Amino acid sequence: DRDGSIEVQSDETLGHLSDWLSLKTMALRQLNNLSAKSQLDVGQRLKLDFSRVGRREFEEKRLAYHKNVQDRFFKQFHVVKTETLTLKEGDSAWLLAQRYRVPMWLLRQYNSTLNFNLVGTGTTLTVPQVKKQPN
């Protein structure tokens, strides 16, 4: 955003973000008041330091990373159908992704209008069903 912050996406780590910014991980931890043991959550907002790398270069590196993750996935799997499911008590989007063996980034793509920070019991999700690509 204009304030120099981003929303953490699936599969991103503090190490990735630091690399893309040419910063030490500790610098990002300090900027965001994160302890050494803190884990990033998808959807979490983080302040970034663009003093060494411009926003455009950062975004190019970030997009290339995500494209690579998706390309590798689709070389192995393809979506055969989708199913609409409603979360029950004790369910979460993460558990659903685990149960159906789909990455969170793919589940988020199929439910792009949902705020995943607010997903809970009663939320309806479209779940892609994947199958291994034939050799």
Which functions belong to the PLM regions below?
Residues 1-135:
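Extracytoplasmic low-complexity/disordered linkers and repeat tracts associated with LysM-containing
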